[in-house]
């Protein structure tokens, strides 16, 4: 199984520090709990029904023509490769590693390409997978470029899969409004923007025929009733969404400025995280961990990702820990 952020209990054991003392900055999640409505008893007692209004709420929120709720976008990442015969698949790298692993596991030839390689050899591919904004680099490609790539793939029956897990703070850059185009598949994560990763909910936006095939592959009741109810309420609350969007954008700017102020300029990021690429990334990760501050280390990239602190005391704690850091290089 691949490594992911959020493994706080393991970090607490490794560094022998109480779990309650940790500041977890290892994930790219909104750090503030969303005010949740009361869940009716029927959501717990009855089997989930597909015509409960969740799909309509999701289509309105994402500005999409059709949507399929799934148990986190990870469920779709693992299932989509089973819907194609063996193919030549490129993943725009570096990115969230589950994509390449899922396509390899399903028997496809997987290439990890740069943008330059995609631009030069796109006509050799059956499927292209892009994480946009990129995780962990934060780089974002324009809709125009992605749609150009899609047109090239679709002419030959290919797919463009775009993982937009971190797109909610910049909805104008989303391909969701174009997701009815044949061969274009957009994945959206619910938990990151709404700060509810434990809900395990995501959406696949694509042409109805493909969604029907994916729905059949995933089976009935893929998303539980309480998750469906909560998501529907939050997806229609436009005022709360705008407050969340503004708060996240401000926090992302503050985090970038904080790192810059300590001589640690980010190499990239988005509203939900900032990435440092530097030779001493491992040493900085270790320095922070010994003070019960958990970040996400990417050894292959010599990079460290910082999520957002949840409150003022967390900001001050990170500030003080960074001030004590002395690079060994």
Each model region followed by its residue ranges:
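Conserved beta-loop-alpha segment that forms the PLP phosphate-binding cup at the N-terminus of a helix
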Residues: 64-89, 202
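PLP-dependent enzyme catalytic core of the Aspartate aminotransferase-like
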Residues: 142-144, 290, 299-329
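PLP-dependent aminotransferase class I/II
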Residues: 183-266
